[in-house]
Amino acid sequence: MSQVEAFSAAEVIAAKRDRHSLTDPQIDWVIDAYTRSAVADEQMSALLMAILLNGMESREISRWTDAMINSGERMNWSALTRPTVDKHSTGGVGDKITLPLAPLVAACGAAVPQLSGRGLGHTGGTLDKLESIPGWRASLSNEEMLKVLQDCGAVICAAGAGLAPADKKLYALRDVTATVEAIPLIASSIMSKKIAEGTSALVLDVKTGAGAFMSDPQKAKELAHVMVGLGKRAGVKTIALVTAMDIPLGLTAGNALEVRESVEVLAGGGPADVIELTVLLAREMLELVGITNVDPADMLKNGKAMDVWRQMISAQGGDPDAKLPTAKENLVITAPSSGTILSMDALKVGLAAWRLGAGRSRQGEAVQAGAGIQIHAKPGDVVAAGAALYTLHTDTPAAFARAQESLTNSVTIGDLPKDGKIDRLPLVVERITD
């Protein structure tokens, strides 16, 4: 016998179409009914578009998030003796920060249950990067996750199928219905998974600039405020940093390339911007869980963070000493003129890395572990005509032409302004606590 439904999809769609607030029972029902396929994709598509056009008030967003959490399981870390804290980034080009950050924060005394994702389009995915390490496993059971956390203090793995299943369905639908940009839907998608993950504290790294999902700083700040509010209402200590993604982070964009750079950072070296953001986020995470007597910068220098990295990779089946994959072919792109690099477009660099095979255009597509871009000079650097700007790496040489096309006009080279300043976003645009 079929279930008697509390509402009809049409009345919920009409309410939002006509700019009314959805009631808590309407929200609970529509998320549950969609998860069990009692609401069709066509109907949910119409509701998502109405939300995009007419928005949601904070109570609606909070209830929508709760309903998505309640569609699946909640993880429980009460068996751990350490406080739990996580970081979520909205993604960008060269954003490998999770790789050095999780072991660094664990080395300082917190537990970091980092449920990560795969890349899509020009933004890289943490799991794709780590899967370039021979033997490393992204899929762990809840019991395996707990064991790695107990033994190492940090785990980076894929979210299980039981975590916010409503979000998985909604995410796929938003992707094909031009409703990805709706801030209430972005915020609830991210926060439903993070709250269900069971962490007691969360630092959000909301990227802005050309290479970010939220390129407009005002929109990025709005998203950050909404997500911080959702976290706090759910009892999770939450803050957000809006950070720059106008130029790539570090000197690599790719999978194995970014793992190598992350290991350099854990060894006490690496690019200054990656070190700065990693340490900054580590301090924020530690402060949220009351660990203030350790300086994460010291843990990078003394090798403790590297020790945790090696343990964590080994615990997930990887070999921390294995040679990382390299691409079969490479091509150097040179500077067309002499001068100071005044700007670099992160989006163009990210698209080029994607075209070389470092990313995917559809969920489930394979990526090339060795593909990507090395960046030899960044804004503020002086270059001579003919000097190397980028080295492109791929297993498919036919991809070079399209990648080069993406990189056309990706840098501006000229004379430094009289005041000596380059017009770009500060690394941290804003810190948001409410």
Where do the language-model regions lie?
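Acidic, glycine/proline-rich low-complexity segments that act as flexible tails and inter-domain linkers
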Residues: S2-G94, Q311-A315, V428-D434
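Well-ordered secondary-structure scaffolds
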Residues: F7, E11, K16, S21-T23, ...
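Active-site-proximal beta-alpha loop/turn segments in soluble metabolic enzymes
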Residues: L48-L52, K129, D167-V176, D205-M214, ...
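Alpha-helix C-terminal capping segments
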Residues: L53, P100-P113, K193-G198, R233-A234, ...
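Glycine/serine-rich anion-binding loops at beta->alpha junctions
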Residues: P83-A106, A110-H122
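Short beta-strand segments
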Residues: L115, L149, C157-G160, D205-G209, ...
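A glycine-rich helix N-cap at a beta->alpha junction
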Residues: K129-V155, H225-G231, G235
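Phosphate/diphosphate-binding glycine-rich loops and adjacent basic-rich segments that engage nucleotide
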Residues: Q150-T199
